[in-house]
Amino acid sequence: MQEQSPELYEEVKLFRNAREREKYDNMADLYAIINTIQQLEKAYIRDCITPQEYTAACSKYLVQYKVAFKQVQCDEFPSVETFVKKFRLDCPAALERIREDRPITIRDDKGNTSKCIAEIVSLFITIMDKLRLQINTMDALQPDVKDLADNMNRLSLIPEDFDAKLKVEKWLGSLNEMQASDELSEGQVRQFLFDLESAYADFNKLLHSQ
């Protein structure tokens, strides 16, 4: 029996250094997000998820797509279409959603409403992620919470007495009373995160009702 060459058992590396590894990781992230949006569109068409679940998930993934594509965009991939073609991704529904930059459940008003909704979704996710990572100083949280409150006030479909908006404004008021280096206690972080998760769920319900 002929012996196998030892070279056949050597590990094949896709990258030669940390920079190349980061490049491949970024491309893998973008590939996964585009594929996820494609599968989400199929799930919605087949009534596998509710419109509320779809709207929330799609808004989130469109925000993540923008961040991921910026990490990959270069001369080789000037557009998402070139990336999709290069890696032979079959994702027409995802590309349509990316071009429209809004869930199919949200009506188009020349991008004003959809842009504001995307900002709100992005800020909810950003603030909740910070709290989960124990980033709890006033100067790290207040700018994002202020932007969230401003965007919620700007979105005309949100009522003045909307509970989710009032919760965000309450926490903004609390942060405004703190010094820049002051930290939220463990109990405050837990309550803040609970209030944000509740507010985010209520916001998604409101989108579904439109």
UniProtKB/Swiss-Prot annotation:
One of its GO terms (molecular function) is protein-containing complex binding. GO terms for biological process: autophagosome maturation; autophagy; endosome transport via multivesicular body sorting pathway; multivesicular body organization; neuron remodeling; protein transport to vacuole involved in ubiquitin-dependent protein catabolic process via the multivesicular body sorting pathway; ubiquitin-dependent protein catabolic process via the multivesicular body sorting pathway. It holds the Pfam family VPS28. It is found in: Endosome. Component of the ESCRT-I complex (endosomal sorting complex required for transport I). Belongs to the VPS28 family. This is Vacuolar protein sorting-associated protein 28 homolog. It comes from Drosophila melanogaster (Fruit fly). The lineage of its organism: Eukaryota, Metazoa, Ecdysozoa, Arthropoda, Hexapoda. The gene is Vps28.
